[in-house]
Amino acid sequence: APETFAICLSFSINFNKIMNIAIVGATGNVGRKILEVLEKKELAIDNLYLLASSRSAGSKINFNGNEHEVIDLETFDFSKVKITFFAAGGKISENFAEIAAKHSLVIDNSSFYRMDPDVPLIVPQVNSDHLNNIKKNIIANPNCSTAQLVIALKPLHDLFKIKRIVVSTYQSVSGGGKAPMDELIEQTKQALEKNKIKSKNFTKQIAFNAIPHIDVFADDGYTKEELKMTNETKKILDNDIDLTATCVRLPVLVSHSESVNIEFEKSFTLEKVREALNNFEGCKVVDERADGGYSTPLEAEGKDETFISRIREDKTVTNGLNMWIVSDNLLRGAALNAVEIAETLIKNNFYGK
C-alpha cells in the first residue's frame, strides 16, 4: 500500500470541507470512465462540473442518478473546484491545464506534461512518494500501456532489480478514442460483407489485421508510443532500467496486452515471482499451464486488476523471465489510475506551502 507522506502544493486545499470536482473531456471515452469509477468509489463529491467543447455543451450526462449538464470548457471558472481531471488530449491540456492549476489540483491524462521534470508522473501503487513536491499543481497520468506494465514490474524490481526489458504490446483500438472503436465495428461488417474498406483513423485496415504502428515515427524508427513506454517507465520506476518496445494495434475493442521479457540482476524462483505479484496491490496472477489458464483482453475488460499470466523462465539469458500482462486500458491505464491519484491525495491530507 502507498506510504503516508506530506504533499505540498502552492496553495491550500482542505478536503475536510467541500469537495468540488471538474472533469475536462467528460463526454469522451476516458471522461465517462472517470465518472463510472467515481460512482463506484463513492467519493463524497459536493459539486461535479462536466466540461467539454462548445459542441457538447448543453448535453446531459447521468451521474449517481442525477442529470448533469455539460458546460463549455472555455467559459468555466476553475476557482469553483479543488480537483480537475483532464481527459481531452494533449492540446486541451496544453491550453487549459495551467489555467486550471492556478485554482485547483490538476490530474492530467494526456501526454503533454508526462516528461516535464516539474510534474510527477504517478501510478499510486508504484511511486506515490513522488507526490511529495508538486511544483506546478499538476500531476500526470502515464500512458495506458505504461501504467499496467509498471504495476507488474514494481514488486519484481524491488526484489530482483530489473536490468533490461523487451516488451511487445497488443493494444486495443479504444486507446485511440471512440471513433477508432466505431470504425473497427464498421470495418468488420464491411469485411464480412466483402465490401471495400477505406480507413479513416488507422494507417491500414484494422479489421482482421494487426498494425505495428501507433502514433508518429521518430527519426530512429521507433514510434512515439514506443518511446513513451521507455521514457515513462524510467521516470516512474528507475532511470537505470533499459527498455525497448514494439507497439502494435489489434482489432480488439478494449484492453491492452503485453508480452514482456525481463532480465534481472539477481536470481529468482518462479514461486517467489508469483508470490510477489499476487501480494502486490493491483496485480492478479492467472497462470495455469492448461487450456484457458491465462487472461485475455475480454476477461480484463471492466476489471480493476492488472492480470499476469504465462510466467516462465527465459533460459536463453541469465536471470531471464517471460510473462503476459493484460489490463483494461480505459480503467487501469487511464480513469482508475487518475481517480486513485486523487484518493491518495485525499487520504494523505495534502496541504498548501
Feature locations, PLM:
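N-terminal Rossmann-like NAD(P) cofactor-binding subdomain of oxidoreductases
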Residues: 18-206, 242, 306-307, 311-317, ...
